[in-house]
Amino acid sequence: KKRAGVTGLVVCAAGSQKSEDRARNLDLADEYFHMDATDAVGMYNKAMELTNGELFDVVINCVNIENTEMASILACKDDGIVYFFSMATSFTKAALGAEGVGKDVNMLIGNGYTKGHANVALQVLRDDERIMKLFAELYA
């Protein structure tokens, strides 16, 4: 939310009410909702609603289930960025699906590593006690 600036819209799509509540308690987004991430048309409709028909500039998919590629692609505007950061992603489905619906989006693959990522992650935990608390609850 910090990086999106005052005019940026950060949206959190969760898979359950529990996950939505967990994210909402961190207050890291402007809008929150939960739905089935494999429901591509539902996700498209929600993205259209939240962006007044403009769709998202950037979509980050970190869902750990299969068949969520099209929901991310349809929620993204043409020339936008879809960042797939899940081992469940099928890049064949993503590439052929985007072509099949005529979406010209830039698709990036997250591999879990980038220079300095460990320091950034640790700094986020140091800077935000809410995130540190959640991290400890989930992984300690």
Each model region followed by its residue ranges:
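Adenosine-nucleotide cofactor-binding segment
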Residues: 2-67
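A general structural signal for well-ordered secondary-structure junctions
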Residues: 7, 29, 106, 130-131
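Glycine-rich loops and low-complexity Gly/Arg-rich segments
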Residues: 10, 36-38, 56-58, 83-86, ...
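Short amphipathic alpha-helical surface micro-motifs
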Residues: 15, 89-90, 139
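Generic detector of well-ordered alpha-helical segments enriched in charged/polar residues
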Residues: 20, 45-48, 122, 132, ...
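A short, terminal or domain-edge coil/loop segment
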Residues: 36-39, 66-75, 136-140
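C-terminal capping/lid region of NAD(P)-dependent oxidoreductase domains
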Residues: 53, 123-140
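Glycine-rich phosphate-binding loop and adjacent beta-alpha segment
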Residues: 63-128
